[in-house]
């Protein structure tokens, strides 16, 4: 158990799975660059249809709907994760939902030719559904096929796929590439290509061995896949751990979303999962990128859009750094460092934004704070919330937990997007103080409540939470900090 061998089949399976993460990142960032061009399309199409120019209110509302409907689709999709993975399996679910990506991409890609605003909005809704499902499927699949000793590092690749997707969308959105009046439908429709690639490659990836053994009782097939993925014949301990979990599952009733909040042994991990997802979206990362172009412009950067892409490069670099740190430092430690660093940078950004009109050099301080803020985000709050949810739950409750956590992430993302412009209007630069307060709250919560899962099997983590519940029923203090000090499973293959 806990092999650290990295095999070609394992890397291939994880790489193909993270195409779904890339799709999420790409479709999150792709709508920003061609904003003015798409508004012109909306204006022209509506004017042709009604023979009168649309009001500015209608135009703004339709643009806002085109952006926000993606998050609405994501909320619905993320909450539907369990319906797919329990019925079709992890790999087959990823394969099936690519039909949504192709359908959404076609609608957006052909909306200009058809002169249809409805096709654009419907395409964004469908692609949101697809991305919402991917945010559940990908971390779950990666977590279940990865060796315990490498689960965190490989789990971080989900976030790497997301940030690469955002970066590619920013680059493709440049006016010299696809961000033009003629080519913007190709920019939106590009999502079809990764979907086709993933459809072609997924049949060569194995199904999750945990799903095969625990859900389907196919022990020999699961054993064969584990041996091929991990490059070792000695998987007896892992198979036994899965069989033990399978036996426990057969004695329990099916775990629903409501059961996650009702059952004492699930309540604490689901609250931790939700809080970690909120710590990602309420950290202010989207606000920083919203402000960045204007700040770079004020600092005298000739092409602020390229500076924003530079911030995206920093985003990507530090996600790679996190891949190598997460199994050394641990999830909890990196999350605390990330939240603390972001809180400091958030205060620094507030001060520099308030003083930059009086002191020109303050703009450069603000740029530095932005880049460091982004770096701290990708060390902790960026990657960790996505994959730690899969670690906190056993096979039975995991799909429902991923659905709840994913839905809370998408919902908070939607609310931040909805409320942030108004907050900025009333608070100005002080809006970052609000995010600082959130960051401090999440830091305190993480310090006292979030356990370290590095090097521990799913069974060990689940039993640790059950131990807290049993201890708590005897009127004693729950050993959440003891859980942080449990030694990882020793590598018997080393």
UniProtKB/Swiss-Prot annotation:
In the UniProt record, which residues carry a glycan?
43
The record, for CDD domains, names:
MFS_GLUT_Class1
Q: What is this protein called?
A: Solute carrier family 2, facilitated glucose transporter member 3
For this protein, the record's InterPro entries field holds: Glc_transpt_3, GLUT, MFS_dom, MFS_sugar_transport-like, MFS_trans_sf, Sugar/inositol_transpt, Sugar_transporter_CS
Which terms in the Gene Ontology molecular function aspect does this entry carry? D-glucose binding; D-glucose transmembrane transporter activity; galactose transmembrane transporter activity
Cytoplasmic topological domain ranges are 1-10, 86-90, 143-153, 205-269, 326-331, 390-399, 451-494
Please give the tissue specificity annotation from the record for this chain: Detected in placenta.
Q: What is its main location?
A: membrane
Region (Disordered) spans which residues?
Answer: 473-494
Subunit relationships: Interacts with SMIM43; the interaction may promote SLC2A3-mediated glucose transport to meet the energy needs of mesendoderm differentiation.
Family, as annotated: Belongs to the major facilitator superfamily. Sugar transporter (TC 2.A.1.1) family. Glucose transporter subfamily.
User: Which keywords does UniProt give here?
Assistant: Cell membrane, Cell projection, Glycoprotein, Membrane, Phosphoprotein, Sugar transport, Transmembrane, Transmembrane helix, Transport
